Amino acid sequence: KLNQKYQIVWATGPKQFDIVKEELKKSSIDIEKVPNAKILPYIYNMEEIMNISDIIVARSGAMTITEISNLGKPSILIPLPNVSQDHQLRNAEVLQKIGAAQIILNNELEKDILNKEIIEIASNKAKMKEMGEKASTKSVKNVQEKIYAEIKKIVKGGK
């Protein structure tokens, strides 16, 4: 459904790439022939891909949440289950609570649910904009300058 209207870039991770492609073939989906869809083992220019994306569908590790916030993007987050202290769910909830993200739990993830969430957000430009603006409120501005200032203090013997 989505591939006709939206461009999809899917990074599986190197270990899962062949497995995912094989599972898609078993489901009669030849991803190589799907227009506007690209499946990759890894994305080396993630910030660039995220920057040109309208909606980000991703796991919710700390770096991903930071990138989403810094770029001011609406997102659908699928926390990785069984991680230390359930930190990915807690990360995702930070954006969900302010209306910047939707969460789909891994055990509830089905194509129809994901389709519905993507279409619901993408079909409402005002909602997309609002979610992006809310995400950017969690962005830490001037991080490099702040880190540099702290390092200078430490080097000079200050606290």
Indicate where each model-derived feature is located:
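A short, well-ordered alpha-helix in the C-terminal region of glycosyltransferases
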Residues: E120, K127-K141
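Hydrophobic alpha-helical packing elements
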Residues: I49, E110-L114, M131, V143-I147
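C-terminal alpha-helical cap of glycosyltransferases
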Residues: K141-K159
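A donor-sugar binding/catalytic signature common to diverse glycosyltransferases
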Residues: M46-Q85
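Donor-nucleotide binding loops and adjacent catalytic segments primarily
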Residues: K1-I55, L89-E93, K97, I104-I113
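Two-component system phosphotransfer/interaction surface
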Residues: E110-S123, K152
